[in-house]
């Protein structure tokens, strides 16, 4: 029995031919999925590019639920758009320890934009949440977002996109938490 898939994409190479083949198989068998963009610490990595490729090349509704903090060798954390906070990994522990902090000042506007897009997208799959979104977007809770997101993923309407670096254990625990 297969309940769901984690699709792994390279932050440098993006969607590759084998990704397309496996994606079509998952579509045929109606398997819900989540995307993990790996190798964010590599030169030439680009989370946004990969998310756009997943949308365009695979015809999916890829929705970012995180934003990267730092690029390439300076990749050090993520902004969790659901909880509206940042996670910064400790280099010396190879990502096994981290700090939860406020969103860095230079990412606040971008985080607000992408959180709004995330809420708008999941609200379109939940009538109660859509009504609340129209009245007061700020009053929507983490639990409401998670519930609507889960329903949309199970209906294969949304593909949540996460980024990290598996080699350095950055984003792996976040991915595991997202799957559960």
Question: What are these language model-derived features?
Answer:
Residues 10-180:
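P-loop NTPase catalytic nucleotide-binding module
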Residues 2:
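An anion/phosphate-binding loop that grips the pyrophosphate of nucleotide cofactors and donors
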């Amino acid at each position: 029995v297969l309940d769901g898939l984690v699709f792994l994409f390279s932050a440098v190479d993006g969607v590759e031919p084998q990704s397309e083949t496996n994606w079509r198989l998952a579509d045929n068998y109606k398997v819900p999925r989540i995307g993990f963009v790996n190798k964010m610490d590599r030169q030439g990595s680009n989370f946004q590019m990969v998310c756009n490729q997943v949308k365009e090349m695979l015809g999916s509704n890829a929705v970012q639920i995180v934003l990267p903090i730092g690029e390439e060798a300076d990749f050090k954390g993520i902004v969790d758009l659901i909880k509206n906070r940042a996670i910064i990994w400790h280099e010396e522990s190879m990502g096994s320890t981290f700090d939860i902090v406020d969103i860095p000042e230079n990412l606040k506007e971008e985080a607000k934009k992408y959180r709004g897009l995330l809420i708008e997208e999941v609200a379109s799959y939940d009538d109660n949440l859509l009504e609340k979104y129209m009245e007061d977007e700020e009053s929507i809770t983490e639990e409401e977002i998670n519930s609507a997101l889960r329903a949309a993923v199970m209906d294969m309407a949304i593909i949540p996109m996460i980024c990290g670096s598996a080699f350095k254990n950055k984003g792996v625990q976040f991915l595991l938490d997202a799957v559960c």
